[in-house]
Amino acid sequence: MPLMSALRRIKLSLTVMLLLGAVACEPSTPGEINVKDQAEFKQAVANAKPGDVIRLANGTWKDFEILFTGTGEADQPIRLTAETKGKVFITGQSNLRLAGEYLEVSGLIFKDGYTPTLQVISFRQDKAHLANHSRVTEVVIDNFSNPERFEADYWVAMYGKYNRFDHNHLEGKRNKGVTMAVRLDTEDSQENHHRIDHNYFGPRPVLGSNGGETLRIGTSHYSLSNSYTLVEKNYFDRCDGEVEIVSVKSGSNQVRGNLFFESKGTLTLRHGDNNIVEENIFLGGRVDHTGGIRVINKGQIIRNNYLEGLTGYRFGGSLVVMNGVPNSSINRYHQVVNAQIENNSLINNEHIQLAAGSDVERSAIPVDSQFTRNLIVNDNGRDTFTLYDDVSGIRFADNVLNNVKNPQLAEGFSNQAVTLARAANGLLYPDSQALSEVGAKKDLVVLKKDDTGVSWYPKSDASIRFDTGRMIDVTATPGELREAIELAASGDIIRLTAGDYLLSKVIKIDKPLTLLGDNRSKIEFERSTLFEIVDGGSLKLSGLVISGKRSPDNVGNSVIRTSPYSMLVNYQIKVQNSLFIHLDVNRHFNFLNVAKSTMADSVVILDSHFSDVSGAILAMDKEADDYGIFNVDYAVIKNSSFTNVQGALASLYRGGTDESTFGPHFTLTNSALTNVGTGSKNKSKSSIYLHGVQVTTIENNRFSNTPAIKIEHTVGEPVTRIVKNTLTETPLPTVKELHSQAENTAVIKDNIIR
């Protein structure tokens, strides 16, 4: 072959090879780099220049730990985005770290997985490599939770300076750990001037433990540092994780223009000074434990906020001004000094708490503070103020109450008739021009849910709903009921015709389902449990007869049990108009058995009857480590009867002294207990054992030949009412304070002893 011809062929081959090697990262348009796998992504990042856009191909990227580094410019950031926003799914064990200058990420969805590290999104690679002047926008994190309920992580951790997190959608964090945290653990992350705006913080269910905040700025260790973070125009939708929805633990932050919708807890100025809270709207909708603003520390400004329909009390009230600890350590309660609380509207709320938390330790009252031009209106004319200590250090001036009878605070308040009307923004204002300078301003902007988050991802209602699906009829033919349950969809109703049903396998419940009978549908079962609730499951039983006569001769049977493993998704059980019999084949046959790291939003028993039970009805006491964790938020029993139950009717346990949760709650009304709690294996020696329950109502019941109700108060100010019960051959209830020398506040009255 001639030499020149050979050289031409070699040159052509090299050219083809170079073209093929570069095609994967060839810009489809100038500055745009399309990548379709992780190797191409790493190469694209390594070669990225200011102004470049790296696009991830549509589809699922599994087990993808994204490290996005680079140095862009103010007018030419380096961007990482989706080929089509909302069409790129980051799944499995995945996360995102940003490090560098002027970086921007958008359009991704984190779903069907969890982070293998401490954060899903982190504005740093490691402690030495932070992100500055960078932005995360239009990103979704949906139920991206570690399967171990109490394995803690953050979804978003902001480090560095001058970063922005905006128009993102975060929903369904179910494991322990704050949803979003601003971290100040080095000087390079302090005085950061971050901006957090227009985000949708979707429903966060009750965690049942400390560590369920939605947003935290700083920590107690760095709380004397300033953050200068702006939290603006975010929508907090039913963020119920714990008592602090937003926890500010640093100084000089602004929280303004946000909307809190039916969220349980408060915006808490926990640590740090000179924060401003203004133009926020709290809409409680009369939902339990919905709260407003809690004030601690120095120089806090609370102005032009609107708070309506909030039911919270104590640390969860509509407005709470705390007592402090003299010479407080950095992680306790610093005294309120120079607080300015002005031009706020508090409409139809339950509680305003001043000098809250006053005790032997928290004895430093608020001082040098102002409470001015605030509007406090309640349609029922009730005084919403509770004064726990001396409030002479607060100057009250130019405030308005509406016809409160015998108000505790008179000086600085005009007590008059106030007529309200809804304005165009949907908020209530006085119709009198004379009150135009009192309360929140009329031009207050009510943030719309649709103006937050992303436009291309639904803000769906994830609440558990029974009886919303199809009606499915089944007969007692062997296997038919089990097959119907397996094939049913969420919300379906399975209607059992009259007959005897024998189930030879455990029925796993992984969706909200109703089993409906007409009181002639009898179910027996041959395994150690009839129903097992697993993640996603909730169960309603109505009009059924359930017998344990055919169950195995084992210790520890149950009608319903939870998964033995950690459950992320809270569940509900509702039983009505049903009969449960022969639950006594062997010892400790409980109606409901639960495991550690499981949480019921509610267990409700209505108009039902239980007899011959060798265990307990509700054994919800598996969180015995005294960490403030519990198994059920609301346990409710009404209009029901219990006969010959060897264990306790209910055994609920929430140990420790942590003050971060609202539950558990226990209600027993209009019911009859006969020979309940009398078994020799009943360790509590009580008919009802409640340890650390926060709200208890036991009213208008009949107790016959049962041991005493035993209640142990552990923390906070539990609300316990035991009234109008008839006790026949039954001792009086006992209520004990385990960690306080104060006399307990339980109300025990109008009970009839026979």
Q: Where are the regions a protein language model picked out?
A:
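Acidic Gly/Asp/Thr-rich repetitive segments characteristic of extracellular carbohydrate-active
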Residues: 27-63, 67, 464-498
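Glycine- and acidic/polar-rich repeat regions and solenoidal domains
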Residues: 62-66, 92-97, 111-133, 141-421, ...
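Short, T/G/N/S-enriched strand-turn elements that build extracellular solenoid repeat scaffolds
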Residues: 41-48, 62-71, 91-96, 270, ...
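C-terminal motif of bacterial Sec signal peptides marking the signal peptidase cleavage site
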Residues: 23-24
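Flexible, charged surface loops at secondary-structure boundaries
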Residues: 45-50, 72-74, 98-99, 158-159, ...
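Right-handed parallel beta-helix/beta-spiral solenoid domain characteristic of secreted/periplasmic
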Residues: 27-36, 55-64, 68-120, 143-145, ...
